[in-house]
Each structure stands twice: as structure tokens, then as C-alpha cells.
Amino acid sequence: QWVEGKFTRLFEERWSAWNQLPSVATSSWTGGALACMDYFQLKSKRVLVPTNTFMATPLAVVKSGASVVFGDCNRSDLCLSYEAVVEAAARESLAAVWLVHIGGHIAFDAPKIAEFCRQKGIVLLEDCAHAHGASWNGQRPGSWGDAGVYSFYGTKTVSTGEGGMLVSKHPALIEFAKGYRNYGKPTYEVEGLNYRMSEFTAALGAVQTARME
């Protein structure tokens, strides 16, 4: 079985055990990011993105029909600053924030940004493409916000060549993402496309996840 089989489920289970959140495997980071953007209905809305990130982050916003607002980063960790989020929220009608964990560690301002977004009703999404294996006081990436998305591209700490993983504390988003990655199956209520992870890719990921500390 090349797709939708036991290795995809095993990879998701092992990632969930490490990340402490329900997980959905995708064919890329982009697939997971687009699922988040669609689920939170961010089309035509303003989304804050840090200036220091890979093009995938703002492009996911653009492809979802939302508008990109750029925010400055801290010199100390090269990640989005709390001050930039506060300033952008005062200046713009922000609907969401992409918090990118650059360089293998959690963004230093993650707790403050998360609390601010909760108070203001702003969706907080975490780009965890660099954050495999990271934690802060036992808390894993993707758990500060509404969702987190990992990449398993060839340059990542955990690599399967290509691939992604969406994690979230919201059960409804997890179910949405399962349909989104597979043309909306089985009910076709979700307007998804093909973002499935292959069984070969998932097998590589499951083995590596078992070796993570």
C-alpha cells in the first residue's frame, strides 16, 4: 500500500507522542499551512509574517487570498518580536500571526505573543519548519498557538526528502486537515486537494521520530 496506510498512521502517532498534540501528515509544509489558512477562513484578511523567514510563509498567505503584513524580528533570536505584533495589531486589523521558530529553537517571545493573541482574538499559527526536537520548559512547538506546521524537506533536522506535519489542539482542525489533504474525502465537504504523504515517506519519518530525544 503506497498511500493512506499503516506507516502514515504510525508516523502521526509517533509524532503526536513526541509533540504532545494530535498530528496530520501532509506532502509538504505548504499543504499543512494552506489547510490552516482555509480552516480559519483568512481569505481577504491581514496576516502578520516575520521579515526573517523563508518565502513559503508569506506565499502561503498570498495563495490563500490573504494580505501579508511584515513584522520586525528581535536581534537576540532572529524571530518575530512581541513589540512588532503589538504595533501591527494597533495599526492593522490583524486576523492572524505566523510565528516562525528560526534556527532550531523556540521564538523567545512566543509566550508573550501567544497571550496577546488570545486576548485580542487573533489566530496564532506557528511555522515549526526549523523546530524539530525543540522544547521550552517541556512545551513543544505548535502548542503556543492554534496550530503548528513542520517541514521534513531535505535540509531539516528530521528529513524525509519532502513532507510536512500539522499539529493542533483543535480537534475540528485536525479532522478538517485529514479531509483537506485528500480532496475532501470521505464526505467532500472540505475543498481540499492532494497533499497526501506517501507510505515510503511516512516510514522514513516514523523511524527518525522514534530516535528523537
Task: Label each PLM-derived region with a short phrase.
Residues 4-46, 60-62, 70-72, 139:
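Phosphate-binding glycine-rich loop
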Residues 24, 48, 69, 123-125, ...:
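Structural detector of well-ordered beta-strand residues that form the stable sheet scaffold
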Residues 59-61, 116, 200:
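Hydrophobic/aromatic ligand-binding patch that stacks against planar heteroaromatic rings
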Residues 77-160, 167:
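Active-site phosphate-binding strand-loop segment of PLP-dependent enzymes
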Residues 131-137, 144-213:
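Active-site region of PLP-dependent enzymes
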